[in-house]
Swiss-Prot record:
Pfam family, one: Methyltransf_4
Active-site residue list: D161
Binding site for substrate: K165, D197, T232, K233, F234, E235
KW Signal (keyword) present: no
Protein name: tRNA (guanine-N(7)-)-methyltransferase
Length: 255
């Protein structure tokens, strides 16, 4: 789940409120990691009437139920097109804007936060978007079971939970085992684009992505924000206050 603007990305993280024992329990054993890394933290949130209506009316078409098997994604989207995975789309405003501006690409958004799913479905209906599909499930399991090797043209991970306390850094999403698994799902030449407003997390992302031998950085270190990534209201406000935002864009080396 994106962590930043409540209007853009659901509720912000509150790892001050997560006891160590509870956080430990959230990290069940997984083949990807010695300690389970989830792509989300479950948070309470109210689904609005409009979001619920969108879920009821548009969910059957645009929400893909999780199943531990490979779907026929061309059939799911109704065409064969470049496919971009987004992990944690928050309230979906950026996802919808990117999809609207890139109609030739298909976008698979993975998010567990129900109000966020409803909000993106509402935007899909309002903007008549056909190139988005949603899975409401843990992205790690989606990667493991629903995406074939070398099937993705890109991955977007924008403003993931920073887990800012040092003792919680091990719960951050961008870690070597997950990155290796992501890379296995990328076609040669495909990209991973991450963004964060936490400098410490940006430094970790740069180190982890840079250490993956099958990836190459498209910049000397941090990349200029690509034109396709919208600037959120929260981000714009932070920039006015002098806060930093760091984008990283890496590509998978050709075989």
């Amino acid at each position: 789940m994106m962590h930043d603007d409540p209007n853009e990305a659901g509720l912000p993280p509150h790892d001050d409120a997560i006891p160590d024992e509870a956080a430990e329990g959230a990290d069940a054993v997984n083949p990807l990691h010695h300690r389970r890394i989830r792509s989300f933290v479950t948070r309470a949130g109210r689904v609005s009437t409009g979001q619920r209506r969108a879920m009821d009316e548009l969910g059957p078409r645009f929400v893909v139920p999780y199943a531990p098997e490979l779907p026929d994604w061309n059939a799911v989207f109704g065409r064969s097109a470049p496919r971009i995975l987004e992990i944690g789309f928050g309230m979906g405003a950026s996802t919808a804007e990117i999809a609207a501006n890139r109609p030739g690409d298909d976008f698979l958004g993975v998010e567990v936060h129900e109000p966020g799913v409803g909000a993106l479905l509402k935007l899909i209906g309002e903007q008549d978007l056909s190139n988005i599909r949603i899975i409401q499930h843990d992205a790690v399991e989606v990667l493991e079971h629903m995406l074939a090797p070398e099937s993705l043209d890109g991955v977007h991970i924008f403003f993931p939970d920073p887990w800012h306390k040092a003792r919680h850094h091990k719960r951050r999403l961008i870690q070597p085992p997950l990155v290796a698994h992501l890379v296995s799902r990328l076609k040669p030449g495909a990209y991973i684009h991450c963004a964060t407003d936490w400098q410490n997390y940006a430094e970790q992302m740069l180190e982890v992505l840079g250490a993956e031998p099958t990836l190459e950085n498209t910049a000397a270190d941090y990349a200029p924000r690509p034109d396709y990534r919208p600037v959120t209201k929260f981000e714009r406000r932070g920039l006015r206050l002098g806060h930093g935002v760091w984008d990283l864009v890496f590509r998978k080396r050709a075989a």
